[in-house]
Amino acid sequence: EESTLESARRELEEETGYSASSWTYLFTGPSSPGLTTEMVSFYLADGLRQVAEGGGVDNENITVHRIPLSLVHDWLMDQTGQGKVVDPKIFMGLYFLSRRLDGSGREEG
């Protein structure tokens, strides 16, 4: 069975076409508390480079959007305002990312 980090690496490449040179564990939490015991782990992938087209495998239909971090919140609000479905885990991941970064997009330290 692959580790959560191995899964994250594989999913990043399959779904987005990118690989990362470094990974930082952020947190693990339930995907749907009360409905399932499935847990989801979040990692910060850094040093991205495009290595493939992305878009998923088999019958997945994934569109990759490249949005500057400073514009992500407004872009997500626009998407939900248009009635598009945005996975709440995206907001959760961005929240924990924002706790690690200062306002300039650099890691606090």
Which role does the model predict for each range below?
Residues 1-10, 14, 48, 58, ...:
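Conserved Nudix-box catalytic region and its N-terminal flanking loop in Nudix hydrolases
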Residues 5, 41, 65:
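Residues that recognize and position ribonucleotide moieties
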Residues 13, 17-51, 78:
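Active-site segment of metal-dependent pyrophosphate-handling enzymes
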Residues 25, 33, 50, 59-109:
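Nudix hydrolase/Nudix homology domain
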Residues 54-55:
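Acidic/polar active-site rim loop that often engages polyanionic ligands
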